[in-house]
Amino acid sequence: TLTLEDVEVAEHKDINDEGQTIHIPAAQTTATDDSSKINVSEAKKEVSVTDTVAYRNLVPGKTYTISGTLMDQRTGKAVTVNGKAVTSSADFTPDTADGETTVDFHFNTNGLDDTTVVVFEKMFYGKAEIAAHEDINDKGQTIYIPSVKTTAIDDKTATKLTLAEKDI
């Protein structure tokens, strides 16, 4: 609306006018271990986690970047391996305003037993951050790395000690 001395002199209201439309991008993510196909990874091994990013309201044909960081849910800090934060990024050019893309993380879980890892994602157009999904409590972004321990007990002694018999 254009006014002159408090009098409306022009108006332009067109819900379908692309020139008047502001696109507000959004992203939602789901993390899955490539081996288990669920949100649980094995401890003490190299793992691959795929974070599927569902995006909305992007401009088709433009190139975007998704950057992700693995976070320790307990500490709220980045997960580190050999002193470096575990991060990954991927560029993509959508064909449609709404869709999905993936970001792959490859890392060693040695020393991460009993850790809950949460994937934080940011979306960029050029250097401008246009969307983020960083919820430390989001189960969809969460990968569990369990701690597994075993204890052997002798049937006869009911302890960790066994009798010096021929048949054990």
Please place each PLM-identified region on the residue numbering.
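Solvent-exposed loop/turn and edge beta-strand elements of beta-rich ligand-binding domains
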Residues: 1-168
